[in-house]
């Protein structure tokens, strides 16, 4: 028999236990939301494949992947390795030339893995500041983050002209003959092959596919815009799908969940270019939280936290969250 002396503390502690458990749940929820919103940058540049990467850089691929995954920019690995080719070509121990990003003199870092760790942290920081715009990220990696502010004040989108103007302006301010490399983006992109802006016919694709993709590709590289559904506001995932399909005379509902309900479910083997692909768990919300346009060969075109771009469905984040494929009824 339990005495009153013992029972009373147990009874009165129950509310405190409940409150304690509730606090833990709230903290875990907030932590998850922060992870999705801040630490993970989904999607990325699965359309980019490396070209001409030197063996001195390629041998560190596993290291690049390790820290890119750790920083939430795994889908940018090929871009980061292309950047490294431009920075050092693998001919320096400070392989990503990242010493200056932590306030050290050039080439202070003498361990390639440390250089990659620091360089990818810096890349991730700049990538977020650039809103997922890969070209703006690359140029800012060379110029410094001040270039991002300059672009935001001058149209909000990277152009080669802005890079040239910024270089001249900074050189004048500093009293130097030149400032940075205004052609840095071109120099990095030599080492990757990416998507073709011209939509090519895909065997077995839906009749409307070319019209849809011709419209969608107009916005490639633009940042993700929560709640956006037109060119003026920018696009979120379902907004891009709805807008692009409307250009082919196809009316779709607004949200990813609703678009999922408006399509006929098909298997991955049945899926062809022009079908939709749906995902769950990309943030705390409904069962279906993301949608993309399937383009064939295990890839989709979509608007995600990394911007409007192609993404790989074969492995990684999107594979883990894939729910189903759908065909327009």
From Swiss-Prot:
Listed Gene3D superfamilies: 1.10.530.10, endopeptidase domain like (from Nostoc punctiforme)
Catalytic reaction list: Hydrolysis of (1->4)-beta-linkages between N-acetylmuramic acid and N-acetyl-D-glucosamine residues in a peptidoglycan and between N-acetyl-D-glucosamine residues in chitodextrins
The entry's keywords: Cell wall biogenesis/degradation, Conjugation, Hydrolase, Protease, Secreted, Signal, Thiol protease
Residue span(s) of domain NlpC/P60: 206-329
Annotated effect of mutating residue 167 to A: Does not affect muramidase activity
One Pfam family matching this protein: Lysozyme_like
Annotated family: Belongs to the peptidase C40 family.
The protein's name in its UniProt record: Bifunctional muramidase/DL-endopeptidase CwlT
Gene for this chain: cwlT
